[in-house]
From Swiss-Prot:
Family indicated by similarity: Belongs to the mitochondrial carrier (TC 2.A.29) family.
Lineage: Eukaryota, Metazoa, Chordata, Craniata, Vertebrata
Organism expressing this protein natively: Xenopus laevis (African clawed frog)
Region forming the signal peptide: none
GO cellular component: mitochondrial inner membrane; mitochondrion
Keywords from the named record: Membrane, Mitochondrion, Mitochondrion inner membrane, Repeat, Transmembrane, Transmembrane helix, Transport
Membrane association type: Multi-pass membrane protein
SUPFAM superfamilies per UniProt: Mitochondrial carrier
GO molecular function: glutathione transmembrane transporter activity
Main location group: mitochondrion
Protein name per UniProt: Mitochondrial glutathione transporter SLC25A40
Transmembrane portions of the chain: 20-40, 105-125, 143-163, 200-221, 236-256, 299-319
Summary of the function given for this chain in its UniProt record: Probable mitochondrial transporter required for glutathione import into mitochondria. Glutathione, which plays key roles in oxidative metabolism, is produced exclusively in the cytosol and is imported in many organelles. Mitochondrial glutathione is required for the activity and stability of proteins containing iron-sulfur clusters.
Length: 341
């Protein structure tokens, strides 16, 4: 039982503001290292099937998915830059040579405006809630990470969902603050408050189970590795390994919901932009049935390898950086306490 209460005791020495700083650094580093993979993937997709005006595609900065709108069929947007790539590595080399290394982070800054705050809220909320749950039910401490992970993701997804839809609509036509308010008021008058959370359902169906599985397995793997290497605090390598393993497991289990969520996210985004359309977006379960009808049950697990390549390193980098930051602040706080004695 003592082992299960150790995380709660450790977290006491870390203030929420310090958790926020640690998660902010982790979020920025994760975006910096993972975004080039998605930029290259999008460029390869655009080469094989050029984007047309008004169509959406999903852009991932390692923290969360964002809808991007192809606003000009003849424009020179980063995802339309010319190039003849023979593969992933060739794309990396050619982009750096012809466009400069900065091009590997094309489109990143606007997405960080929401991704970083969402990640900070998510990680801080998780740690704080997990401590509370362990204190209140120490006999069931093993499920604290599962409940805290699911709840934290539900909260952050609910807060960010309206902002993401507004950002998507603004991509297609730049709006002043006054025009934006009129647009929001019109949407509320027509469809009610729930219209701001279009696409929330598929996001929650994927992200909440993912988060619950991820944190539950992460804490188990971390504890197991700490015991194996006889250490009370996880090293960077332990956190990195535990993050990659738990992220991979969660990614595989929730892949069907990711396939559905991606398709519906694009569909909802296009409907939000083309306000004149009377078409209604399909429900999550109808989309899932359609995918099975078109491609069989295996269609729900399409893109497994690309998802693992994206999720595993992102989870590993984020959690290991976050744990390193918490360890730094824990030592700093302990030193301050010793000096005050």
């Amino acid at each position: 039982m003592q082992k299960n209460t150790e995380p709660a005791q450790e977290a006491v020495h870390i203030t929420p503001s310090q958790q926020m700083i640690a998660s902010s650094v982790g979020a920025l580093l994760t975006s910096f290292l993972v975004t080039p993979l998605d930029v290259v993937k999008i460029r390869l997709q655009a080469q094989s099937k050029p984007f047309i005006k008004g169509k959406c595609f999903v852009y991932c900065n390692g923290l969360m998915d964002h809808l991007c709108m192809c606003t000009n069929g003849n424009g020179k947007a980063w995802y339309k830059a010319p190039g003849h790539f023979r593969g992933t590595m060739d794309a990396f080399v050619q982009i750096i040579r012809s466009e400069g290394i900065k091009s590997l982070w094309s489109g990143l800054p606007p997405t960080l405006v929401m991704a970083v705050p969402a990640t900070v809220i998510y990680f801080t909320f998780y740690d704080q809630l997990r401590v509370i749950l362990i204190r209140r039910m120490p006999e069931r401490a093993e499920i604290a990470s599962l409940v805290a992970g699911a709840t934290a993701r539900l909260g952050s997804a609910t807060l960010i969902s309206p902002l993401e839809l507004i950002r998507t609509k603004m991509q297609y036509r730049p709006l002043s603050y006054k025009e934006l308010m009129i647009c929001i008021q019109s949407s509320l008058a027509k469809d009610g408050w729930l219209s701001l959370w279009k696409g929330w359902g598929p996001t929650v169906l994927r992200d909440v189970p993912f988060s619950a599985l991820y944190w539950h397995n992460y804490e188990l793997v971390k504890q197991s590795l700490c015991q194996r290497y006889n250490t009370l605090q996880p090293t960077f390598a332990i956190s990195f390994t535990a993050g990659a393993v738990s992220g991979s497991i969660a990614a595989i289990v929730t892949l069907p919901f990711d396939v559905v969520k991606t398709r519906r996210q694009v569909e909802v985004g296009e409907l939000e932009v083309f306000t004149y359309s009377h078409k209604r977006s399909s429900s999550t379960w109808k989309l899932m049935s359609a995918i099975v009808a078109e491609n069989g049950f295996g269609g729900l697990f399409a893109g497994l390898v690309p998802r693992l390549i994206k999720v595993a390193p992102a989870c590993a980098i984020m959690i290991s950086t976050y744990e390193f930051g918490k360890s730094f602040f824990r030592k700093l706080n302990n030193e301050r306490q010793l000096k005050s004695l």
